[in-house]
Amino acid sequence: MPEQGGDAGPALALTATAFTHVGAVRARNEDTVAVDDWVMSQSMDQPTTLERTVTRPMVCLVADGLGGHTGGDVASRLVAERLAGRAGETADAAALADLLGAVDQALFAAMRERPALHGMGSTVAGLHVGPGGLAVFNVGDSRVYRIEPSGLTQLSTDDTPGPKLDDGRTAAYTTPLLTQSLGGWQDPEGIAPHVLREPAPGRYLLCSDGLTDRLDPGAIADHIDDDDVASVVALFEAAMAAGGDDNISIVLVRLRPA
């Protein structure tokens, strides 16, 4: 992501293969995936691949509505639509963090208007890409990985009460507890989004904990090859074979020179 007033870098081409599914146990899908202006929260039968030339800011993301809370599906959809619709307002990392804070407040405003939705919330993890560069962002425990020949590198930070690594990220730690989310039960006192500038081009995996709670990073990497659609299907099938007890959302993103 360029700093405000910075020069635009080389034009980028984006290819994203996206998939969201209710899983084997849950009654409804409370995840949402988005690529640019395409937003999907209905359980899918097969992945969808979208291509864009990055001539303006856009996002790719997964949002996971908080399970066990009222309106998780409403929350994740609102988060995805607001971030996708306002991606062009974020000229730098600070503006992206501010936008995430505004989406958090929009959830609390929606709860005040519709008391039946009190407590609804969502995680989010994604990429913000524009003509000048790339940023990784997240709130909650949905994840962003960079895919490399040697394996996966986690770029997002888990907002869970797990042990901290030397670089400040949270170690892999399966728990239903979150230290922050967008919306939720906590008072609307603001959030501290994680925003990380990342060099492009590259290949990235965005996913909800329906994948990462079932497969460790090594197992995830073992199911990824050069075919993005086949990789997404293999990851989904592995998560289902491991129980499929949560909604499962996966987005594979390739960024390359246009």
Model-derived features: where do they sit?
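PP2C/PPM-type serine/threonine phosphatase catalytic domain
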Residues: 1-258
